[in-house]
């Protein structure tokens, strides 16, 4: 499936003059940032189609030859930089004609609407006018109005390329049951201070470690039946967080997939064969996490706690929380901890997971990290 970026011409690829007609070579100027942005989108798998209204093109007031020269030069310059358009679609009608082929009408789109090889979920439209956004709405695709002096707009080409090619990995999960109401919001491509409020201060402190040391924006709000005990709140928070990770990662293209420590980690302790994965020290405690976003949930925990609870968090729910995250995210996680202080051991587990996540979710290209073709 191939995503298509439909683009307006005047004011979007090339700047629009005061008379709204680019009918001379000296009027040809490219919009800032358009070429590097389109190269990035090309490398992300996009094909390009120009869709442009050219009022009265071919008439005495706007001869075809006056249009063709600058337009052909524009296409040649794009091609010289590695940007080739799949098609150039021009509507020559006047606004008063109300032609179905004139944007925001989609009359020119019939062959594309019949093409089952197009990935419409990723396709988009870029233009400088509100009619371009209406055109996108009529196609049921995303529309970006480029920022211009004439018509406003909120986007520049760099931002559009980031939004589409980098596909910011965000998720908002609302999990409501008779026992809990959990909301998790995360953005794997934005660094921000974590915010958590579950009614369990120590648990909040642990959840903050995941966002802080995982290097991504994390907001968790939970209301649970704490008058009974902590089990439902902690378990359902893990399930909601796991679901959010799964949704934000999408098809997992480009990610590292694995989170682990290389064999020459400076944190390894000689003679301790139980340690593997991302190994993290915390005073006398050492914790390690190795993980794989394989899509096959599996959890192994090696550790114990002397105390029944740390703060307001029962220690028996520490591995249960991580198991819940694995079940909902499709994560394979091996978590090991050794130490004397249970506070340090619990916190070490959360921090080790966070650092392993940081490595696994990092994007390193666009390839799918699996020979199976799916994760």
Swiss-Prot record:
Protein name: Histidine biosynthesis bifunctional protein HisB
Chief localisation class: cytoplasm
Transmembrane residue ranges: none
Pfam families named among the record's database cross-references: Hydrolase_like, IGPD
GO function terms (MF aspect): histidinol-phosphatase activity; imidazoleglycerol-phosphate dehydratase activity; metal ion binding
Recorded GO CC terms: cytoplasm
Catalytic activity: D-erythro-1-(imidazol-4-yl)glycerol 3-phosphate = 3-(imidazol-4-yl)-2-oxopropyl phosphate + H2O; L-histidinol phosphate + H2O = L-histidinol + phosphate
Family: In the N-terminal section; belongs to the histidinol-phosphatase family. In the C-terminal section; belongs to the imidazoleglycerol-phosphate dehydratase family.
Keyword RNA-binding part of the UniProt annotation: no
Compartments, as annotated in UniProt: Cytoplasm
Stretches for region Histidinol-phosphatase: 1-168
An annotated GO BP: L-histidine biosynthetic process
Residues covered by region (Imidazoleglycerol-phosphate dehydratase): 169-375
Binding site for Mg(2+): 8, 10, 128
UniProtKB keywords: Amino-acid biosynthesis, Cytoplasm, Histidine biosynthesis, Hydrolase, Lyase, Magnesium, Metal-binding, Multifunctional enzyme
Pathway connected to this protein: Amino-acid biosynthesis; L-histidine biosynthesis; L-histidine from 5-phospho-alpha-D-ribose 1-diphosphate: step 6/9; Amino-acid biosynthesis; L-histidine biosynthesis; L-histidine from 5-phospho-alpha-D-ribose 1-diphosphate: step 8/9
EC number: 3.1.3.15, 4.2.1.19
Cofactor(s) required, per the database record: Mg(2+)
Annotated active site: 8, 10
Originating gene: hisB
């Amino acid at each position: 499936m191939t995503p298509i970026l439909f683009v307006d011409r005047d004011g979007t690829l090339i700047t629009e003059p005061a008379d709204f007609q680019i009918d001379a070579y000296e009027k040809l100027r490219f919009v800032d940032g358009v070429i590097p942005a389109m190269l990035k989108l090309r490398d992300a798998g996009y094909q390009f189609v120009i869709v442009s209204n050219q009022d009265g093109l071919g008439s005495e007031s706007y001869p075809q030859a006056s249009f063709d020269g600058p337009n052909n030069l524009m296409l040649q310059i794009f091609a010289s930089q590695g940007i080739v358009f799949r098609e150039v679609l021009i509507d020559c009608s006047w606004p008063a004609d109300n032609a179905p082929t004139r944007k925001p009408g989609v009359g020119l789109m019939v062959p594309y609407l019949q093409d089952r090889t197009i990935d419409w979920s990723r396709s988009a439209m870029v233009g400088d006018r509100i009619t371009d956004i209406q055109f996108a709405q009529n196609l049921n695709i995303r529309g970006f109005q480029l920022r211009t002096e004439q018509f406003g707009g909120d986007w520049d080409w760099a931002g559009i390329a980031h939004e589409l090619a980098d596909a910011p990995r965000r998720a908002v999960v609302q999990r409501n049951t008779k026992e809990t109401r959990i909301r998790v919001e995360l953005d794997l491509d934005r660094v921000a201070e974590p915010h958590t409020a579950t009614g369990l201060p120590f648990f909040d402190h642990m959840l903050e470690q995941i966002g802080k040391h995982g290097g991504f924006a994390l907001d968790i709000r939970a209301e649970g039946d704490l008058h009974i005990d902590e089990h439902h709140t902690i378990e359902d928070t893990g399930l909601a967080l796991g679901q959010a990770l799964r949704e934000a990662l999408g098809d997992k293209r480009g990610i590292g997939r694995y989170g682990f420590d290389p064999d020459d980690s400076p944190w390894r302790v000689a003679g301790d064969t139980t340690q593997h994965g991302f190994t993290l020290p915390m005073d006398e405690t050492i914790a390690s996490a190795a993980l794989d976003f394989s899509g096959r949930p599996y959890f192994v925990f090696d550790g114990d706690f002397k105390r029944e609870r740390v703060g307001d968090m029962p220690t028996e729910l520490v591995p249960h929380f991580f198991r819940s995250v694995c079940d909902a995210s499709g994560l394979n996680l091996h978590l090991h901890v050794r130490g004397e202080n249970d506070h340090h051991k619990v916190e070490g587990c959360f921090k080790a997971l966070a650092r392993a996540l940081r490595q696994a979710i990092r994007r390193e290209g666009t390839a799918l990290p699996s020979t199976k073709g799916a994760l």
